[in-house]
Amino acid sequence: MIQQKSPSLLGGAMIIAGTAIGAGMLANPTSTAGVWFIGSILALIYTWFCMTTSGLMILEANLHYPTGSSFDTIVKDLLGKSWNTINGLSVAFVLYILTYAYITSGGGITQNLLNQAFSSAESAVDIGRTSGSLIFCLILAAFVWLSTKAVDRFTTVLIVGMVVAFFLSTTGLLSSVKTAVLFNTVAESEQTYLPYLLTALPVCLVSFGFHGNVPSLVKYYDRDGRRVMKSIFIGTGLALVIYILWQLAVQGNLPRTEFAPVIEKGGDVSALLEALHKYIEVEYLSVALNFFAYMAISTSFLGVTLGLFDYIADLFKFDDSLLGRTKTTLVTFLPPLLLSLQFPYGFVIAIGYAGLAATIWAAIVPALLAKASRQKFPQASYKVYGGNFMIGFVILFGILNIVAQIGANLGWFASFTG
């Protein structure tokens, strides 16, 4: 009998990194503008460690169940129906709010690109934000409506383009980083940047979301917990490095005070690119940066809405016929599209709310799963490092994120406006 070769660590790591890295990273420089570069690195490393650990806690619980068992199955068995309902609602909320966030920013960039493409020295074309959002949403929603295969093929093309555009834009930006901008002195009106650290956490959290992929990796590696663990560390580590490079590229070129118009527009990505454009001397870098942002938002939009589409189809029992897929498409896309037309500047705010809901299923629930699984299966072959202390540490991280998001909305904490 020919022994089947075990999948490489790189394959699993790419699944994790590919899931985590997306349009969420575009919000990080704006959400961390208050705490600035050093503080943003601390926030990202802290978030990376806690989110990686919580992912490993899902792995620990998952290994006690048959291959292919879903996240929902494990939560229902270990924590009961109530927690499973809360978990399911938080997942749906995150998917809807991210869809809204991507339509708002994707619409803004579509608007800018079309205006540039169809304007000339003699006449200027002014396509509105509403039209940009409608065009962006309708074209990409058509791929989701068609089939998963259509999404798969189009996403592959977008990812290749995104990687090329990312390296073209960031290498150029990194070469022009100014240390005076990156390590700027504290403004006279502020004694320290630390008060802004807490409110940056919920947006950073969204940048490390991969937890729904853990059951798939358990199946992929044939229940080899150590290999799954290593692939998670490599994948999230790669995401962390890319995020730090992105912070360096943006916050090393765009002065802290210049984030004011970006923050005023809710962290809108097109506003960030417009502000950054003033400090880019080479024209091709602006073009590459625009394409990178557009493709990052498009790939994230397709990935998130495909998951939401399947969730809606299962929830309402819509079949896979033409009529069934049309119903699912309307329920999936219409609410966030209408919201984006009503509130067109809410990208970072929406990402923050997504972080608030994601805290439940990506931090608190995994920690509770680890605790419950150790009580139910005391002889486990794989346990996450840190014992009960680490369970408490991850739950505290989740609570801090919830307090940060709610506190920021209620004005409890300092808010940076540029």
UniProtKB/Swiss-Prot annotation:
One example of a Gene Ontology biological process annotation: amino acid transmembrane transport
Q: How does it sit in the membrane?
A: Multi-pass membrane protein
The membrane-spanning stretches of this chain are 7-27, 32-52, 89-109, 131-151, 154-174, 194-214, 232-252, 289-309, 321-343, 345-365, 384-404
One Pfam family, please name it: Trp_Tyr_perm
Reaction(s) this enzyme catalyzes, per UniProt: L-tryptophan(in) + H(+)(in) = L-tryptophan(out) + H(+)(out)
Coarsely, its chief localization is: membrane
Molecular-function GO terms, alphabetical: aromatic amino acid transmembrane transporter activity; symporter activity; transmembrane transporter activity
Gene Ontology CC: one annotated term: plasma membrane
NCBIfam families from the entry? araaP, PRK10483.1
Family membership:
Belongs to the amino acid/polyamine transporter 2 family. Mtr/TnaB/TyrP permease subfamily.
Quote the function comment for this protein. Answer: Involved in the transport of tryptophan into the cell.
Q: What is this protein called?
A: Tryptophan-specific transport protein
Q: What organism is listed for this UniProt entry?
A: Haemophilus influenzae (strain ATCC 51907 / DSM 11121 / KW20 / Rd)
